Amino acid sequence: ELCYATSKYPNKGFTYGGVIVSNCDLYIDSYKPAEKPMYYAWNNHGGIVEINGQWYIFYHRHTNGTPFNRQACAEPIRFRDDGSIIQAEMTSCGLNGGPLIGKGEYPAYIACNLFCKHESIYTAAEGLWMDARFPKITQDGKDGDEEAGYILNMRDSATAGFKYFDCRGIEKVSIKVRGYCSGHFEIKTSWDGEPLGTIPIGFSNIWQEYTADI
């Protein structure tokens, strides 16, 4: 977590204020149990910036199933009447200022929730990789190549969450899949909700687009 403390002095008397953001959404209870991790966390670094009158917390999420690969993120900060900070929920929106438009194409690497039935708060023990049981954001190419990221290891029970989208008027959802697989993706509006639609997929060693009604 990135946390904060306050004091009337620069060098003493600090009082712990709480969590500003957790890179696994720990302690957030607005959409899931407070202790349930919704991403694979490790350490966290960041800072607070005011942009056009709105305060933001910058932080990072982890990618590639290791503690050493990081994705820069930002969330708006809300304050209580007494000036204390309300913990920010992880989203896919960044500095957008509201829900993303539900039309068009978005990269999978903006997923703000990523987990499976093998629950883990941490990305991996230091120096180790998360094995093939766990979904992870990755990319093709070598270090420094500008390649679009995607989610690897979307196996049975793997869940990727994207928040928030304005999907008014949306009747179809498409995904692009590559891999030796057979099954389907379920489209939901909550991690434990009922499916709004199902997208069957099949084997392919190139990216294929699949579409379903919702």
Give residue spans per PLM region:
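Carbohydrate-active catalytic/glycan-binding domains of CAZyme proteins
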Residues: E1-T198, G202-I214
